[in-house]
């Protein structure tokens, strides 16, 4: 699936603009992580990782009241259009409910960055400048340590980047933040 097709699929399935921004953030984080983990990532590999980020929650509005169906409905709708490893990574980011445990680096990258994108956006919104460009990894790390801040962002899920991807937490945050800063206008921040 091309990026254009994936973006069209996303906008066909998701109407909430904040959810679309979340997908865009996860897409650029996944692309950055792919480059970080695969120094010589080819176009096919980059497209797969980007597609996972861009479509991982594309059925959210259809399944928000049935979390066990999240990603499985998407598979029914477009699974035949995606490479099997892309669809698996999408399902694995909801593995606590679907039973499809993350196996590959792509699976784990999506699982870890999903929560981090929200934490970074929340940090930007409380920053004095209220934008991503002024945000630093240190500022995000400080918020990461505050359990009362952005309570919906599961820290344990983000921190698995160290065990499963062998990327230190601060570097993981830096990679994600730098990626998101590049598309800050698209994210409204």
Give residue ranges: language-model regions.
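Amphipathic, non-membrane alpha-helical segments in soluble helical-bundle scaffolds
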Residues: 16, 20, 106-109, 166, ...
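Acidic/His-rich, divalent-metal-binding segments that scaffold phosphate/diphosphate chemistry
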Residues: 1-65
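Alpha-helix initiation and N-capping motif
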Residues: 3-7, 48, 83, 137, ...
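Conserved active-site and cofactor/substrate-binding residues in soluble primary-metabolism enzymes
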Residues: 1, 21-25, 69, 104, ...
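Alpha-helical scaffold segments in soluble metabolic enzymes
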Residues: 9-12, 25-32, 73, 77, ...
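Short coil/loop linkers at secondary-structure junctions
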Residues: 40, 81-84, 168
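Divalent metal-dependent catalytic cores for phosphoryl transfer on phosphate-bearing substrates
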Residues: 45-147, 159
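C-terminal binding/interaction regions
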Residues: 14, 139, 145-174, 178, ...
């Amino acid at each position: 699936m091309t990026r254009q097709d994936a973006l069209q699929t996303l906008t066909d399935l998701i109407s909430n603009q904040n959810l679309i921004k979340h997908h865009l953030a996860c897409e650029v984080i996944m692309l950055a992580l792919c480059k970080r983990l695969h120094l010589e990532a080819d176009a096919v590999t980059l497209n797969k990782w980007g597609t996972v980020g861009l479509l991982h929650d594309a059925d959210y509005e259809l399944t928000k009241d049935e979390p066990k169906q999240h990603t499985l409905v998407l598979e029914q709708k477009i699974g035949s259009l995606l490479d099997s490893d892309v669809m698996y990574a999408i399902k694995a980011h909801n593995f606590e409910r679907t039973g499809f445990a993350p196996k590959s680096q792509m699976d784990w990258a999506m699982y870890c960055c999903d929560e981090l994108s929200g934490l970074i956006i929340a940090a930007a919104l409380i920053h004095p400048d209220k934008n991503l460009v002024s945000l630093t990894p240190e500022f995000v790390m400080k918020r990461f340590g505050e359990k009362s801040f952005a309570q919906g962002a599961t820290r344990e899920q983000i921190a698995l980047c160290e065990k499963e991807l062998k990327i230190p937490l601060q570097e993981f945050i830096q990679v994600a933040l730098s990626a998101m800063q590049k598309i800050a206008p698209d994210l409204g921040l």
